[in-house]
Swiss-Prot record:
Annotated binding of ATP, by residue: 11-16, 116
Annotated localization: Cytoplasm
Name this protein carries in UniProt: Shikimate kinase
Span list, region LID domain: 109-123
UniProt keyword annotation of Ribonucleoprotein present: no
């Protein structure tokens, strides 16, 4: 079994689904944003504000290469922009948690949106969402309809890997 890599826009449920998959499959769960945040000693928002998005993307790219060296399979929850990296290919089986923009925004309360620097301006966030759609689809081994909630997404992933 390869790594199971969850991709999708912020708020699509990657972190929650990763935890459930880890429990169901008895695999360790890794969260790329959390790993970067812990290593740098700043939240993702603080990294963007203090070090810039380019530095965050460099940390992300380096982490992908590092994760490729792990010998045992993991469930990997990724940040929404990870699909911008060519080296994502070969990390594992990727599942795109697809959801429309309006549903994503409804799922995130104000406190959650404040933690996500790229959601500061909803017009710009929607443009970013639309730009990334093709990248998510291009990088996906499987597309998961994430509008049906966590249990439905979990069932879909488990069916694909059965």
């Amino acid at each position: 079994m390869q790594h199971l890599v969850l991709i999708g826009f912020m708020g699509s449920g990657k972190s929650s689904l990763a935890q459930e998959l880890g429990l169901a499959l008895k695999l360790e769960v890794l969260d790329t944003d959390m790993i970067i945040s812990e290593r740098v000693g700043l939240s993702v928002r603080e990294i963007f504000e203090e070090l810039g998005e380019d530095n965050f993307r460099m940390f992300e790219k380096n982490l992908i290469d590092e994760l490729k060296t792990l010998k045992t399979p993991h469930v990997i929850s990724t940040g929404g922009g990870i699909v911008m990296h060519e080296n994502l290919k070969g990390l594992g089986t990727t599942f795109y948690l697809k959801m429309d923009f309006e549903t994503l925004i409804k799922r995130l309360n104000q406190k959650e949106r404040e933690k996500r620097p790229l959601l500061n301006n909803l017009t710009q966030a929607k443009e970013l969402f639309e730009k990334r759609q093709a990248l998510y689809e291009k990088n996906a081994s499987f597309i998961i309809d994430a509008r049906g909630g966590l249990n439905n997404s979990l069932k879909q992933v488990l069916q694909f890997i059965a």
